[in-house]
Amino acid sequence: MLSDSEHKMSVVVLFGGMSSEHEVSRVSAGTFVDQLDRQRYELLTIGITKEGRWLYTEADSAQMADGSWEELPGNMPCVLSPDRADHGLILFTPAGQVEKVHVDVVIPVLHGLWGEDGTVQGLLELAGIPYVGCGVLASAVCMDKAVANAMFDASGIPHTKWLSATRWEIESDPDGVCDGVIAKLGWHIFVKPANAGSSVGITKAHDRDELKAAIRLALANDRKVVFEAFVDGHEVECAVIGSDPAVSTRPGEILAGAEFYTYDDKYKNGVSQVVIPARLPEEKLDEVKTYAAMAYTALGCEGLARCDFFVEKDTGRVLINEINTLPGFTPISMYPKLMEHEGIPVPALIDRLIALALERTEKQHG
């Protein structure tokens, strides 16, 4: 049950969520639960089911990962109060009582829609509770690949050729959309839901029939589709932390087990490999680092993010792919591996992220 500790900072790890990345979130959150320094922090865990129910739980990381946390007898329905006077949670106990719990900081370990897209961040801003990671605007912009690509273009950050189309545009003139995409991008074409992460719903199309099928899959995951020209290059990723200034790590490289870095590659079959630092010349590693900090700053990121790039094999051009404002923290995830390579183990990283969250709130209200 909840303790009355006064000397420890109360930290909520918020996990699960209603997105297609629910399972990944549960595993990522387990890392925070296991690595949080219990001598310094009072841990509170709140799970969000796929149906959107918020439950206070005392589940351990294994129960979170396998999904059994939802059935634990000690779970209690809860809400995060937007009332700044509450500054925390409201629990509904089995005895029918209402219990208020003060919260000092929230770690929203929520990947994808309804968590990484500015929605939960907006709730936390209303509540006046410090939280780890990017703010409302950066979270929303980076979640939408079309908006992020437009921002990259406006900021002069090199990106592969791209187009986007809404469901209405596609359904109104499907052949016209396909013609326009093929004419601008050529083959091959990556087709992506605008608002999805972890490679969910992404297809590489090699011909018109595959393009049509890829569009149908993307529309099953979102109402807007992004089309990007294929890049034959190294897939590299930088971890970025802080703001004013943002600090980026040396990039790591993904050696994908398929034609591209799929959801299964990332989280299931384990055939992909990670190489740190990336297999690139030193000056190219520095160039990627520079672009990572530029992109992070241009899109208003704070706290942490992972910036993903392609480095073309023929030309050496560095092209940004996307920014993930709440990168994975699973045992195979790149962000914590990159930080560990810089000499920052996960417990120290969590301490730093919490400190950054508190610093931001102090600057806003100080």
Region locations from a protein language model:
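ATP-grasp fold ATP-binding core
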Residues: 152-153, 182-200, 223-232, 236
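Rossmann-like NAD(P)H-binding beta-loop-alpha module
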Residues: 154-193
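Hydrophobic beta-strand scaffold residues
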Residues: 43, 130-131, 159, 189, ...
